[in-house]
Design a protein with these regions (language model features):
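A residue-level signal for beta-strand positions that form part of recognition/binding surfaces
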Residues: 57, 113, 152
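Long, amphipathic alpha-helical surface segments
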Residues: 123-144
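G/A/S/T/P/Q/N-biased, glycine-rich low-complexity segments that form flexible N-terminal tails, linkers
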Residues: 1-7, 32-33, 48, 97, ...
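Stable alpha-helical elements in mature extracytoplasmic
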Residues: 9-13, 26-30, 81-84, 88-91, ...
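Short, polar loop/linker segments at the starts of domains and inter-domain junctions
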Residues: 70-76, 130-132, 166-176
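Peptidoglycan-targeting cell-wall enzymes and recognition modules
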Residues: 3-20, 28, 35-106
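Acidic helix/loop microenvironments that form the catalytic cleft of cell-wall polysaccharide enzymes
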Residues: 34-38, 103-126
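C-terminal, disordered and strongly charge-biased linear tails with low hydrophobicity
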Residues: 23, 144-187
Length: 187
């Protein structure tokens, strides 16, 4: 969670969206739009438009900002990264409708980024929609080039592991932290 007034990172946004069930291409599409709207700043505020200005990562205005405020008791620009991503992923009628419209056509990160710009952000600038699509494609490419680690499983308590070859088992165990002893195995 980015500190108040501080920017989140692109990775915080992409990983946060993936954790909420979005694909890499969908997450990249949304992250690209957030980059162009607020440069990943959860506290971003623009006093113009919507009667109350534009707030937060998505620069929500008017009814959308008020719906956020009704749900969380504060405007988006006063909320955390997680609260804003939760709202994007929520079943709020307008958020869900806009999100479904943006993702309905499917496609590449570029196509989704363009669609999120046109159908979720709805600023009406076709050239900007395309630019955001290009940014989404670049984000997806960066993310897909990162080495992926398997699912991390945290285990507490005594554990008995049986393996035919303890050396192979040891190659698959990764020490995350602490003073856990991995030097015993039952054969």
């Amino acid at each position: 969670v980015a500190p108040r007034g501080g920017n989140a990172s692109q990775d915080d946004v992409v990983r946060g969206l993936i954790a909420r069930g979005f694909t890499v291409d969908q997450a990249a599409a949304v992250a690209a739009n957030i980059k162009h709207e607020s440069n990943y700043n959860p506290a971003a505020y623009n006093p113009a438009g919507g009667g109350i200005g534009a707030h937060g990562l998505f620069q929500l205005r008017g009814d959308r900002a008020r719906a956020f405020q009704a749900r969380y008791g504060k405007l988006p620009s006063q909320a955390t990264l997680d609260e804003q991503l939760d709202f994007f992923a929520s079943n709020d009628p307008e958020e869900a409708r806009s999100r479904r419209a943006a993702f309905a056509g499917g496609g590449s990160a570029a196509q989704l980024g363009t669609a999120v710009s046109a159908k979720y952000e709805r600023h009406g600038n076709v050239a900007e929609d395309l630019r955001r699509g290009q940014t989404a494609q670049a984000i997806a490419a960066q993310y897909n080039q990162q080495p992926q680690v398997g699912q991390q499983i945290n285990i507490n308590g005594p554990v008995t592991v049986q393996a035919n070859d303890p050396k192979e088992l040891m190659g698959g165990i990764q020490r995350v932290g602490g003073a856990t002893n991995y030097n015993s195995a039952v054969r």
